[in-house]
């Protein structure tokens, strides 16, 4: 069996070496996501024979990432066979997730008609043109511009944007604690945010917040694992302050995403309100 070890901060360089070679437009290949969510998903990794193997699950149900090598070298079929053997040794089926089209074709070529493929709609990433989110030009985004213009008019001189620093990190986390208290389904995200904030410099994470009359009304965290894409890991705002979500989205993108082509706002997890919001862009 493969000798999997729990993911820790010390695995950052190893994960980056394998997973940042190519943008697969799936946030689960982001080293930041792998590390900050490791505790929630019980993520483990193993490097063997030039491949990095990653598995997540509680021991009863485990999900494997496709084995990745440096420069697509090595025996991919043999690497997948190791996953199959590992799963079968535990009496499980081998379930491989986060396949892009290239990896799906590679897997099917190596194992014709052996795997059944299903779309994971709730886990699909929302990828946007970066300049579109920065400028909000066009008819589709007219409503977003209106929300921002109303916010700027209503709160002129009363709001300010701050980058995440050691000086405001506790305020940032306190806001998210208060926000998450209203919805238990975001407790796991709170744990991930705690890891991200405690190690934001080491992990290369950028953050931003908006204050209104000195009080935080919106926060966000993101990172850039690939040359052409920025990933937004966390975004929260006050529902009772119209325009706050649109403001934090645009303000952060303006300051951090000018030099990338895409912005990945991750998945909606099947949450109706989140899906509606992300589709609206």
Model-derived features: positions:
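Amide-forming acyltransferase catalytic core, primarily the GNAT-like/NAT-type
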Residues: 1-49, 184-189
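A residue-level signal for conserved active-site and pocket-lining positions in enzyme catalytic cores
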Residues: 15, 151, 278
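Conserved donor-binding loop and adjoining core beta-sheet/short helix segment
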Residues: 27-102, 211-240
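Short catalytic-loop micro-motif centered on adjacent basic/acidic residues
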Residues: 95-96, 160-162, 262-265
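Conserved active-site alpha-helix within GNAT-family acetyltransferase domains
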Residues: 103-117, 269-281
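Acyltransferase donor/substrate-recognition loop-hinge adjacent to the catalytic core
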Residues: 111-184
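A mid-sequence, solvent-exposed acidic-amphipathic segment
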Residues: 166-231
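Aromatic (often tryptophan-rich) hydrophobic motifs at membrane interfaces
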Residues: 206-281
């Amino acid at each position: 069996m493969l000798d999997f070890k729990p993911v820790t901060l010390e695995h950052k360089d190893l994960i980056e070496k394998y997973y940042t070679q190519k943008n697969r437009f799936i946030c689960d290949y982001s080293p930041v996501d792998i590390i900050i969510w490791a505790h929630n998903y019980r993520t483990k990794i193993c490097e063997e024979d030039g491949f990095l193997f990653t598995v997540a699950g509680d021991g009863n149900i485990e999900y494997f990432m496709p084995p990745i090598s440096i420069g697509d070298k090595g025996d991919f079929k043999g690497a997948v066979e190791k996953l199959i053997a590992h799963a079968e040794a535990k009496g499980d089926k081998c379930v491989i997730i986060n396949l892009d089209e290239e990896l799906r074709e590679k897997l099917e070529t190596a194992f014709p008609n052996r795997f059944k493929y299903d779309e994971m709609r709730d886990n699909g990433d929302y990828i946007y043109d970066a300049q579109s989110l920065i400028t909000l030009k066009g008819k589709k985004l007219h409503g977003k511009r209106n929300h921002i213009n109303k916010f700027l008019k209503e709160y002129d001189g009363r709001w300010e944007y701050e980058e995440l620093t050691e000086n405001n990190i506790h305020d940032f986390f306190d806001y998210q604690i208060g926000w998450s208290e209203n919805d238990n389904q975001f407790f796991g995200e709170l744990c991930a945010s705690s890891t991200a904030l405690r190690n934001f410099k080491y992990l290369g994470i950028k953050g931003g917040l908006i204050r209104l009359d000195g009080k935080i009304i919106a926060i966000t965290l993101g990172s850039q694992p690939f040359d052409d894409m920025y990933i937004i890991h966390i975004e929260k705002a006050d529902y009772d302050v119209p325009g706050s979500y649109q403001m934090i989205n645009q303000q952060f993108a303006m300051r951090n995403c000018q030099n990338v082509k895409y912005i990945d706002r991750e998945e909606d997890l099947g949450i109706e309100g989140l899906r509606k919001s992300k589709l609206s862009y």
